[in-house]
Amino acid sequence: MVKRQIPQVVQEANAFINGQGYLGVVKSLTIPKIEQETIEAKGALGGNFASGTIKPVEMEFKLSVLDKNTYLGYGLNTWNNRIPFLFKASVFQAGKGAPEPFSMAVTGDVVEIDPGSFESGKEMEVSIKLAVHFMDISIGKNQLAMFDVENMICLIGGVDYLSQVRSNLGE
């Protein structure tokens, strides 16, 4: 028998930049996509095959507030130690009881702050784009993915797919 999956709904979201919360002004969050580098096999029947490497990851989020802390994050990440970005949400799914927590911790370089256009009577939309160097995504008590570029760790579903690569390199 086929069992229908019920969609999940984000009830509310919050972002923390260098410890400061942005509850109520998080407009959107694009969760980073994890994408394989591929190589093309040519011939009578060509195809693309995974190369065992992951493309660089970027993410973007939008706030409806422009403040000193967002620009401070740009400066600290560029010329000092990277500051943490933490994204939390409450995710509801009908028939599952209580909503579950979503959590994504990210560090990386702020590559762009786009304050957008100013229009009288309109809500602001400030876009912040990050080049992600560390990411840890969980929903409920389940870690979905964690990767750490600097330490060459890629955990997906609890499996570290780069452990053998580190071992091959003597790490």
Please state what every model-predicted region is.
Residues 74-104:
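Short, acidic/charged, Gly/Pro-enriched secondary-structure junctions
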Residues 38-44, 82-83, 90, 123, ...:
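Eukaryotic N-proximal low-complexity acidic segments or loops
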Residues 51-55, 77-81, 98-100, 120-124:
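A generic structural micro-feature
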Residues 6-12, 80-86, 131-132:
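A short, compositionally biased
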Residues 1-68, 107-118, 156-170:
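Solvent-exposed edge beta-strands and adjacent loop segments
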Residues 68-73, 139:
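Short, conserved charged micro-motifs
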Residues 58-62, 84-88, 103-105, 127-131:
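Beta-strand secondary-structure signal
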Residues 109-171:
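Mixed-charge, glycine-accented linear interaction segment located at domain edges/termini
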